[in-house]
Amino acid sequence: MEETMNNQEAPETSEEETVAVENTKAEKVLPNFGPGDTIKVHARIKEGDKERIQMFQGVVLKVKQAADGGNFTVRRISYGVGVERTFPFLSPNVTKVEIMKKGRVRRARLFYLRKLSGKAARIKEVKQTPS
């Protein structure tokens, strides 16, 4: 039984994956955004053997910072139905993030927006002063 276990190669995850994750961290530079901001996420979608870039524009509900990169959740209304997507910061499928509007909110988690609709779900926009 020991011979069969020795013949099987264990997946080498320690060095190779660590180097890959560190390279991803070094290459990924996303703009500084937070809850309440309206952003456009360019996500790589694989359908069968084809790949394409799909844009997902919506309001950031939460940003979770973590040692492994963290993630952020974006919500939009599509054909009258609320759609939320969570994107990892270090995902190779997130190609680009654009900030469309900066929102002014007083909460770190905007889950209350799920219950609101129409004008009640609006977020005040922060006016950018020219530098």
UniProtKB/Swiss-Prot annotation:
One of its GO terms (biological process) is translation. Gene3D superfamilies: 2.30.30.790. GO terms for molecular function: structural constituent of ribosome. Residues 1-11 have a biased composition (Polar residues). PROSITE patterns: RIBOSOMAL_L19 (PS01015). Coiled coil: none annotated. This protein is located at the 30S-50S ribosomal subunit interface and may play a role in the structure and function of the aminoacyl-tRNA binding site. Belongs to the bacterial ribosomal protein bL19 family. This is Large ribosomal subunit protein bL19. It comes from Dehalococcoides mccartyi (strain ATCC BAA-2100 / JCM 16839 / KCTC 5957 / BAV1). The lineage of its organism: Bacteria, Bacillati, Chloroflexota, Dehalococcoidia, Dehalococcoidales. The gene is rplS.
